[in-house]
Regions:
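S-adenosyl-L-methionine
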Residues: 1-16, 195-232
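Core catalytic lobe of class I
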Residues: 1-192, 235
Length: 236
């Protein structure tokens, strides 16, 4: 059965108001990190707390600089509780945070849950990132990485929501993994790119095929030798 999807061009704060309570299983998104956009994280958390089903997950990327501020925002949403922090380890280049005189080698991915949700299997909290593609958008994330998160924090047939769709990576990953998808993007040109990518994904994929990402693809090399059968690594 072909997964269904729904795409919306507009302001996520307005579009999400039209979603029913407890209608989504996973919210996975990469909002902008610049200071002027940080209040959007609070809006995202409040809406996620409303639209997520019991035992659903909220997962989002965030820069180090505003990590504390954003975590305080999400802590004010009673429906959500902190679950875990995943490290997106950048193997191809490390950024200098000039205001803090700090070299940054990984990006935080924050995971919150509603209820007592647990992931599928034993997902790792270190994801390796080589040179990621920028073919569609300057802030584009890797499809394999998004698919890994989708596969572990939702189940086939679940509904995944991305309120900051960008070029559509989360949508592509969700449909490849056999999930329903809802995406929202403000910029008309970027929305058109996302729409084309997602439509092409459905055209290229078999209707009943779920693409599985091998666990080993996302184990940091130093962690690979130390991997416990149930997940986790030591002495990193």
């Amino acid at each position: 059965m072909t997964p269904h999807y729904s795409l919306h061009q507009g302001d996520a704060r307005e579009v999400l108001q039209g979603l029913e309570d407890e209608s989504v299983d996973l919210v996975l998104s990469d909002p902008p990190y610049l200071e002027e956009f940080i209040p959007l994280y609070g809006d995202l958390a409040r809406e996620a707390g409303r639209v997520l089903k019991q035992d659903g997950f909220l997962i989002f990327y965030i820069g180090h600089y505003h990590l504390e501020t954003v975590m305080k925002m999400v802590a004010d949403v009673p429906a959500l509780s902190y679950y875990w922090l995943v490290s997106q380890w950048n193997m191809s280049g490390m950024a200098k945070i000039m205001a803090r005189r700090q070299i940054c080698g990984f990006k935080p991915i924050l995971i919150y849950r509603k209820g007592k949700a647990l992931p599928n299997g034993w997902p790792l909290d270190i994801l390796t990132m080589g040179g990621r593609s920028k073919n569609f958008h300057a802030w584009e994330q890797d499809v394999k990485e998004s698919r890994y998160l989708v596969q572990h924090y939702s189940r086939p047939g679940d509904t995944v929501l991305d309120p900051f769709l960008g070029s559509g990576t989360t949508g592509v990953a969700s449909l490849q993994a056999g999930r329903e998808f809802v995406g929202v993007e403000l910029d008309p040109e970027t929305f058109a790119i996302a729409k084309t990518r997602i439509e092409r994904t459905l055209w290229q994929s078999h209707a009943d095929r779920t693409v599985q990402t091998p666990l080993e693809e996302w184990i940091a090399p130093e962690c690979n030798k130390l991997l416990h059968p149930l997940g986790g690594c030591n002495n990193l």
